[in-house]
Amino acid sequence: MRLLFFFSILYTASLCCQLKDFLPCVMQLSAQKVDFNMNPIEVIFNITTEAKLMHTCRTYSRILPCFDQKMVQCGKPSEKTQLERGKRLHSYLCAPFSLQRQKIFLRRSKCIQDVLAEPQSSVCNRNDTVFADKLQSCREMCTRPDCVSKIELSEVSTCTYINIGKKCTAEAAQFFAQMQQVLTNKEYPMQCQYDLRKKPESELKKGLPIESLVAQTTSSTTYVTVHPPALPSVIDGVVTRTSLPIMRRTDPNSKFKPRPTTSQSNGPVIKTVIVDERGAPMNQPTSTQKPKVVHKFLPNPYTTKNPNTLKNDIIRTTRTIIPVVDKHTYVPWNYKVDAVQVSTLTSALAPVKPTETVISSPPVAFNFKLPAEQTSTQPFRVEINWHDDEVKQEPTKAPGVFVSPWYLKTPSHIPPEIEFATPTPLISSPLEAVSPILSQLKSNSLNFTELGNQANNYFSAALSAFAETKKEMAHNDPWRTIIDAVAPTIHKFSPDVIPRIREEINRIQPHQQKN
């Protein structure tokens, strides 16, 4: 579309630039099948689709430098101005930021073209519009014959603008006006000179203010003329017309001369004076408002080297380790020594486990001697004889009732394999019985699977022998003592045996009570 506008420029510039100079540019337009015309508005409104608009914009973007080069070679200033107008119109419709304007153009171009095809006149209803005031101002300010033609053009343009707004919406009218302003770089539709600024109001009447007939206590304004002392026209050898101090000193002795402290005033000074009924000035009441106290920034509060711990801090606790005299020392799980349970074994082999009940006295220490390693893992029956001699049936108080060889009559007798004793807290090594196990742990030769099998065999044999006893047992049953003493060790090495022991005890005890 701008190519057509440029061809109109070429027609006017043919006196300086020949047509053959622009022939390469015209050939490029023909190759791209872009129409051209002397009227740029007609070229613009012949575009009806978005694809054609994009094609025209791309073609102009490539060909405009060709016209610029030719204008630099043989163009006049007026011709260059026409080319600049075409560039502005191209930017208005084809710039990357003109997408909204392109949409408006594609929607309203057909309606605008229909309005422009009609005959234009200067007669239309301009009431209630700003154009009426502007045209009236143009007529009042027009004092030359050439401004009359501009007024007539403005009348026609305003009617065109109003008709487009009525038939094609106000959006189309604003778009058409903006396009004309970009093309001519002037206001549209007004083309004449006008001035709508309000005239300044008449100056206020000078003189003293009118006072009321009834004098009352009020705040009146009085005009007081202050005449400052005459100032010398020459200060330090420099003529000045202002009251600003002169920074440069031309006279070396001028620093001893006093400086004027009163600024020069040409007009009267207005002061507000509070008067009473007689017209005498009254003293203004003093303000009781206290001045604001400005608190300067205080230093940071003093902080100690040991600040308070936060609520969420975790208080660390220390564990007192009992000095170990013997490396084989072991404290049973249910024995409390200084509220700390310590084990010489590693955590994986002998973990420290708390219990719900803690006894006050030390438990019964025991020495459990393991037999030689066995190759057979099958359970076997063991008959335990507490005496080396033959079993003698000793009569009891009841006739026909004899003492069982498996029942320990005197507590002073100590079996050869299992020894019972009540140790004191001062015993140096309460775990002498497990010294072989500790030695095997250090040498990494202990087989826990075989040890568990041996423990199962021993307890199976013990329970079998214990089940054959049908006599009533005393309250201090030695088998119960054995089980209580050996249970922690069995629980540590073979925990699966404990439920079996409990089942056997529960099965045997009711049977003993019946007998």
Swiss-Prot record:
Disruption phenotype: Resistant to infection by the microsporidian pathogen N.parisii and displays a fitness advantage phenotype, whereby there is increased fitness following infection by N.parisii. Fewer invading N.parisii spores following infection at the L1 larval stage of development due to impaired orientation, location and angle of N.parisii spore proteins relative to the host's intestinal apical membrane. Does not affect the ability of N.parisii to invade intestinal cells or N.parisii spore consumption by intestinal cells of L1 stage larvae. The keyword RNA-binding does not apply. Induction: Up-regulated following infection by the microsporidian pathogen N.parisii or the bacterial pathogen P.aeruginosa. Its main location: secreted. GO terms for cellular component: extracellular space. GO terms for biological process: regulation of entry of bacterium into host cell. Keywords: Glycoprotein, Secreted, Signal. It is found in: Secreted. The keyword Glycoprotein applies. Glycans are attached at N46, N127, N447. Expressed in the terminal bulb of the pharynx and the posterior of the intestine (at protein level). Expressed by intestinal cells and secreted into the intestinal lumen (at protein level). Residues 248-267 are annotated as: Disordered. Residues 1-16 form the signal peptide. Plays a role in promoting resistance to bacterial pathogens such as P.aeruginosa by inhibiting bacterial intestinal colonization. (Microbial infection) Promotes infection by microsporidian pathogens such as N.parisii in the early larval stages of development. Involved in ensuring the proper orientation and location of the spore proteins of N.parisii during intestinal cell invasion. This is Protein aaim-1. It comes from Caenorhabditis elegans. The gene is aaim-1.
